[in-house]
């Protein structure tokens, strides 16, 4: 049938952060078992990751942390932490010197004596997305409302609490989330490959997105 196109763009999103000590239910479910298992000592890489992701510094800042053991027999007890500090609910930033210092001091109290911990800057892999929504014509008068709903879904998907180091972006997962809205017939991301792979020290972050509407 005949199609009508409209475009909509949201750039440089800034979202107010939540309470500084408000650990999310998802964080508690994911990292709680590791903390319990470690008996308040940092023994395994999972312990370091759990501790780092639940850590708040002296200024109330939190962030995302991953840990790896440096390769090579002679350095088996060197733990490399990769850290990013939370700027907003959907944005990470390079961790401040204060944040790194506070994290390292807290770790020193709980780590094994034979472990040497090195704090490194994590890397943000930003995405710019061009998205096409296919809607039935009868929804044309509700276009702005639908765009707002879809935008909320997108921002929720990319919330810092949902992102992890070494977690690839799978296009189909976001398309599926947008498709959950009853008004959306189809949703496609048009400008990136099906999988955006990241390294162990990288984390995905949304930079901006545009919504194109195609009426069926």
Predicted regions and their residues:
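Short loop/turn elements at secondary-structure junctions
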Residues: 58-60, 73, 176-202
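Short capping/connector residues at structural and topological boundaries
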Residues: 41, 48, 174, 189, ...
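Catalytic P-loop NTP-binding/switch module of NTPases
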Residues: 1-50
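Carbohydrate-recognition loop of C-type lectin domains
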Residues: 39-167, 174
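Preference for short coil/turn "hinge" residues that link or interrupt alpha-helices
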Residues: 29, 36, 158, 162, ...
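Generic beta-strand hydrophobic packing signal
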Residues: 13, 65, 187-192, 209
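Immediate N-terminus of the mature polypeptide
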Residues: 2-7, 17-25, 122, 160, ...
């Amino acid at each position: 049938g005949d199609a009508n196109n409209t475009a909509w763009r949201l750039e440089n999103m800034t979202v107010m952060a939540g309470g500084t000590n408000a650990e999310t239910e998802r964080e508690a479910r994911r990292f709680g078992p590791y903390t319990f298992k470690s008996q308040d000592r940092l023994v395994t890489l999972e312990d370091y990751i759990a501790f780092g992701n639940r850590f708040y510094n002296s200024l109330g800042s939190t962030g995302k942390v991953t840990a790896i053991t440096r390769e090579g027999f002679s350095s088996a007890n060197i733990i490399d932490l990769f850290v990013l500090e939370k700027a907003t609910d959907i944005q990470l930033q390079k961790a401040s010197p204060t944040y790194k210092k506070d994290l390292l001091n807290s770790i020193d109290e709980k780590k094994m004596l034979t472990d040497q911990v090195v704090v490194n800057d994590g890397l943000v892999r930003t995405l710019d997305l061009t998205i096409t929504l296919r809607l039935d014509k009868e929804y044309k008068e509700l276009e702005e409302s639908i765009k707002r709903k879809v935008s909320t879904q997108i921002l929720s998907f990319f919330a810092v609490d949902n992102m992890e180091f070494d977690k690839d972006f799978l296009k189909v997962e976001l398309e599926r989330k947008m498709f959950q809205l009853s008004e959306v017939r189809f949703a496609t991301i048009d400008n990136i490959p099906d999988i955006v792979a990241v390294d162990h020290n990288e984390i995905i972050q949304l930079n901006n997105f545009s919504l194109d509407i195609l009426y069926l």
